[in-house]
Curated annotation (Swiss-Prot):
Keywords annotated in UniProt: Ribonucleoprotein, Ribosomal protein
Cited SUPFAM superfamilies: Ribosomal protein L36
Family: Belongs to the bacterial ribosomal protein bL36 family.
Protein's UniProt keywords contain Ribonucleoprotein: yes
GO MF term (any one): structural constituent of ribosome
One Gene Ontology cellular component annotation held by this UniProt entry: ribosome
Protein's recorded name: Large ribosomal subunit protein bL36
UniProt gene name: rpmJ
Keyword Nucleotidyltransferase: no
Lineage: Bacteria, Bacillati, Mycoplasmatota, Mycoplasmoidales, Metamycoplasmataceae
GO terms for biological process, alphabetical: translation
Organism, scientific name: Mycoplasmopsis pulmonis (strain UAB CTIP)
Covalent S-S links between cysteines: none
Signal peptide stretch: none
Length: 37
C-alpha cells in the first residue's frame, strides 16, 4: 500500500474508489495499491 498526495491509475486494471472520504486505487496487482493521505 502506497500512501501518496496524488493517486493515479498505473494500469488498465486499476480502479479508483472513494471510501470514507479517502481516495483509493485497487488493482489485481498488489504493487499498484494506493491511497491518498
Amino acid at each position: 500500500m502506497k500512501v501518496r498526495a496524488s493517486v493515479k491509475a498505473m494500469c488498465k486494471d486499476c480502479k479508483n474508489i472513494k471510501r470514507k472520504g479517502i481516495r483509493r486505487i485497487i488493482c489485481i496487482q498488489p504493487k499498484h495499491k494506493q491511497r491518498q493521505g
